Amino acid sequence: MIQPSKSFAHRFWRKRRVVAPGRNDLRKKDDVNTFESIPAWKSHRKILGMSAILLPLTPNREIDWNGLREHLVRTFDAGLVPAVNMDTGYANLIDEATRVAVLEETQRIASGRMFVAGAFVGDQPQAAFNLDAYLRQIDSIQRHAGTPVIFQSFGLTALQDAELLAAYQQIGAATQRFVGFELGTMFAPFGRIYSLEVYRELIQIPQCMGAKHSSLDRTLEWQRLAIRDQVRPEFHVFTGNDLAIDMVIYGSDYLLGLSTMAPDLFAKRDRMWEAGDVEFFHLNDILQYLGFFAFRDPVPAYKHTAAQWLHLRGWIACNLTHPCSPSRPDSDIAILKTILNQCAPYL
């Protein structure tokens, strides 16, 4: 049985709300907020899609291991890269034994294919940066042939810029490759969106293959794409904006929770973009509608929406969410059915 956690992060994540990000000191004063400042489309591009995997539950709220295995297979078969032990997999709510068991199952099913996994270090406000805890998580992920996604923590994001970059360099020295992660404080109190100067240095760490950007601000993500194109074109800017999944047309790749609901449809959409098929926009509109519905306030309840949707599709046996994660009303299911009907031509 999954037991509720009483950690600070757990209590906060249950209650978090998304608010529209305001203009702040991350925006340059000379930014030009005109159409001309928006990056050009990068059409006919092969998109690298990473999909955060929902950890499904049984009716008695134990982990549905068979449902997890089948969803991993489904995601691999669609051509997406599974991302396990992320927020969608209750990263802040599961214990270490469960975390390792998920890695073991994923490694077995991957059979040498790429997957990524969250390196989550839970700490408290004013905590010191705990490099050893990060290295333990990284070692566990790499021993299971995964690529670590470096979650932020209070200790990490409290560092001054030079110390912060040194910390990522230490992480890089211990990894074959890793994915960075910027998280806005509207999602978690330990999150931080880095300055453009820090970002420019971060993407030059050789082992850092990419970074997920979750500010919910297109302009901030466009700025990162511009820096990427100038400094390191092979670097992956992974959009984490489930409310703007069309960021891929500007050159972002993605690491999304929304895609766990439809890895087949996201993969089909991505192929349409590579082929130059205008049907991309029609399918993207439906998926974005699903995203707006799933990620409405309270945002953490998107995981319950995902469970309802996957159950509706006959992919998991139960639509329950984690007992410490907020839930959605059963009345949502009727709306999800209408969205699923809209998806029918693409299934």
Where are the regions that the model predicts?
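C-terminal alpha-helical cap/extension of soluble enzyme domains
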Residues: 37-38, 51-54, 79, 252-253, ...
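N-terminal polybasic/positive-inside topogenic patches
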Residues: 2, 22-25
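Active-site beta->alpha loop and helix N-cap motifs at the rims of alpha/beta catalytic domains
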Residues: 31-191
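Catalytic alpha/beta core domains of metabolic enzymes, predominantly
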Residues: 179, 183-299
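N-terminal cationic leader/targeting segments used for protein routing and processing
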Residues: 7, 16, 25, 29-30
